[in-house]
Regions:
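Accessory alpha-helical/coil subdomains and C-terminal extensions
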Residues: 1-6, 23-151
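Glycine-rich, charge-decorated loop segments at or immediately adjacent to ligand/cofactor-binding or catalytic sites
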Residues: 13-21
Length: 151
């Protein structure tokens, strides 16, 4: 009996394939994740408009330890770039200090800010948590970035 099998990578991170994206340009799963983040950011924008002055910054963490495809998809929520939306990727080269400076500038400009940060965004050792094997728990970056930016 002959059996032919085909494997199809499915990841929402859109990080499978060659660096030039000649073999795979979008993985199954990424499109629905991109749409989800677009909807989330639109909803957060409406909530952010109604926040009091003391809660004028909304920080969201998106999956993507080493690739910023999902945080980048949040821009789909605002094609005309009217929202005070900032996106920070693990591979973007920003520091926590530059993120805070950019947020402060946006607060001075528009009075509010929405920050979408990749879970792999480097916050240095700030609030770093490890699992039982000593691996970094990347989900913690949302809390540390949010705490650093809001405070």
């Amino acid at each position: 009996m002959e059996l032919s099998a085909t494997g199809v990578p499915k990841t929402i991170d859109n990080d499978v394939g060659d660096p030039e994206f000649r073999l795979i340009d979008h993985t199954p799963g990424y499109g629905s994740a991109a749409r989800y983040w677009s909807c989330i950011v639109q909803n957060v924008n409406e909530e952010n408009r109604g926040m009091s002055v003391s809660e004028s910054v909304a920080v969201l963490q998106a999956m993507g330890r080493k690739s910023g495809w999902i945080p980048a998809a949040s821009r789909l929520a605002d094609p005309e770039r009217l929202m005070p939306l900032q996106m920070y990727f693990a591979e973007g080269g920003h520091t926590l200090e530059s993120l805070a400076e950019n947020v402060n500038r946006e607060l001075q400009r528009s009075g509010r800010c929405i920050v979408v940060v990749s879970e792999g965004f480097d916050v240095g050792g700030l609030g770093e948590m490890h699992d039982g094997f000593g691996h970094i728990e990347y989900g913690a970056s949302r809390n540390t970035v949010a705490q650093a930016v809001v405070n």
